[in-house]
Amino acid sequence: MQKFRKEDPTFRVHRDEESNETIISGMGELHLEVYIERMAREFGVEVQAGAPQVAYRETIGAAAPYDYTHKKQTGGSGQFAKAVGTMTPFTATEDDEDKNYKFNNKIVGGRIPKEYIPAVDKGFQEAMSKGTLIGAPIVGVQMDLEDGAYHDVDSSEMAFRICAIAAFRQAYEKASPTALEPLMALEVSAPEEFQGNVMGQINQRRGIISGTTTQEGFVTVNAEVPLSEMFGYSGDLRSATQGKGEFTMEFSRYNACPRNVQEELVKEYQKQKAEEAK
């Protein structure tokens, strides 16, 4: 797989420590099928591949305040940290290095000592790695740290990091969390006689057609389609065009999921959490 990564930067591999599985990701179902087939053919490796998974994201639709105190007393020194501020939706500009997250330190008068500020920032970013709505990474969030408190003995970087994680989640629940799905830019080419079939299939997959062109008896249809609706498309297109249709697909952007899709994703995530808790 390292060989494939060197050949193709869009082919990515990582290890999921929780499930003990190797996760491969790429530009689409067909892209991954090619590499699975190559593993068997070139290296004699039998691969047990699970169903493809869509890389969903989460974001927020509204601003929300947070005011959280982390306090823990054990034998000896305890833990104390307090963070107060606001979570707001964030749209990056060209000047922003991080396009998904922004942290503003608005602390004045030493309410939180300078050495603990990076721990708060780190805690916020840690909380963003897995949202509480569907368990997906969170994007498009600005965290303003406006006030707080510390203790001379019981405060530490760890206490402020833990406080920040909890403060983030406190605000997130009130900030209208929303699931985002990846949309793909799809281009389909087929003989003109199959135009109706091609467009019908795209509509069935929640696709939005942006344009069609015809040339020398062939029609080209451009559309934006959710990735989750594209599994099995290559076979369906072959059937609908007597094997004469072709398509290309690449990532376009993330967009809010329709309500029914989000409800289904939430239900699946709750079920998964319940099974893990057993």
Predicted regions and their residues:
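Accessory interaction regions appended to the cores of large information-processing enzymes
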Residues: 1-278
